[in-house]
């Protein structure tokens, strides 16, 4: 009898695959239906962001950050603004901090809604995305009313935020919060007990805590494995230290735990939003939203029409930009996907000398081989969905 040669089978997953979430290409080595090896090929969305930012003034660099994790753009701007503010040694007024926190949490909900509902869609549930996107639409409108853009906001600037929020907008955000809890409960009732969803996610992609630290995981990926590590609590920035919220922590470190954590984080984000809205309509109702140093923050239009000095400040800001004292700084925020960090080196000029981005998705994607080995081919899309990867920040 002739001996048949059994060999492993190589297939491409993506870049055109609907579950590949963008331009991911995975080269999978399969033994039957079992995954033996995963080789992620990245760089299909590389735009040279870091280098481009080194040729721009500090203000012109802001829009590049929106185009990294474009699902929750303001959270990226936040890290950059914090880094520049630390080098300049300037304070953001309380009202400005509250607006930043409010919009960071809106970004977190935008991100988690997209992730949770598309994760459900990847394993075959078609209702959740329709419900989730209805809520995301309302939040996108809040983005638009704050800064004029639904996605690429350029709203958080070094020194504060671009413009104050009208009271009506803050009231509308307040009115959105309570009905959102009902929507979340509906989503919860639909997905959480679902037998098929559980079979596709429980005990899939398990990460032990020591492995999570070793791979450089952060955010939900670490909390799913049992560590209560959240930069908003452990290294508070802005006014997070004054906010009341809980950190949900998983115990199994599988895809299902990560899903549950994202669901609970949306509730906690809504709690933080409620506190911000109450303060913004209460004792912080009036006040500046950005630093009053006009060498860094442009003066108001009305002021420019009256004062020659204000006009000169405005002209200098938008042509030459401000000079940042020489030094280096690392600023990180708890972005929806994990720890988003900005390492900034200034040489005293009006442009950054070196600009390094620490994208959480990059660290998560590099563990794809470690996570998928020994799983079935169908589990790859479930694992990928639970990592929450957006290619803008991975390839940058």
Swiss-Prot record:
Q: Which NCBIfam families match?
A: NuoD, PRK06075.1
Superkingdom of the source species: Bacteria
SUBUNIT field: NDH-1 is composed of 14 different subunits. Subunits NuoB, C, D, E, F, and G constitute the peripheral sector of the complex.
Q: Which PROSITE patterns match?
A: COMPLEX1_49K (PS00535)
Gene assigned in the entry: nuoD
Q: What does this protein do?
A: NDH-1 shuttles electrons from NADH, via FMN and iron-sulfur (Fe-S) centers, to quinones in the respiratory chain. The immediate electron acceptor for the enzyme in this species is believed to be ubiquinone. Couples the redox reaction to proton translocation (for every two electrons transferred, four hydrogen ions are translocated across the cytoplasmic membrane), and thus conserves the redox energy in a proton gradient.
- Similarity comment text for this entry: Belongs to the complex I 49 kDa subunit family.
Tell me a GO cellular component: plasma membrane
Q: What is this protein called?
A: NADH-quinone oxidoreductase subunit D
Give the way it sits in the membrane: Peripheral membrane protein
Concerning PANTHER family, the annotation shows: NADH DEHYDROGENASE [UBIQUINONE] IRON-SULFUR PROTEIN 2, MITOCHONDRIAL, NADH-UBIQUINONE OXIDOREDUCTASE 49 KDA SUBUNIT
Q: Which UniProt keywords apply?
A: Cell inner membrane, Cell membrane, Membrane, NAD, Quinone, Translocase, Transport, Ubiquinone
Question: Where does the record say this protein resides?
Answer: Cell inner membrane
Q: Which HAMAP family match?
A: NDH1_NuoD
Q: Which reaction does it catalyse?
A: a quinone + NADH + 5 H(+)(in) = a quinol + NAD(+) + 4 H(+)(out)
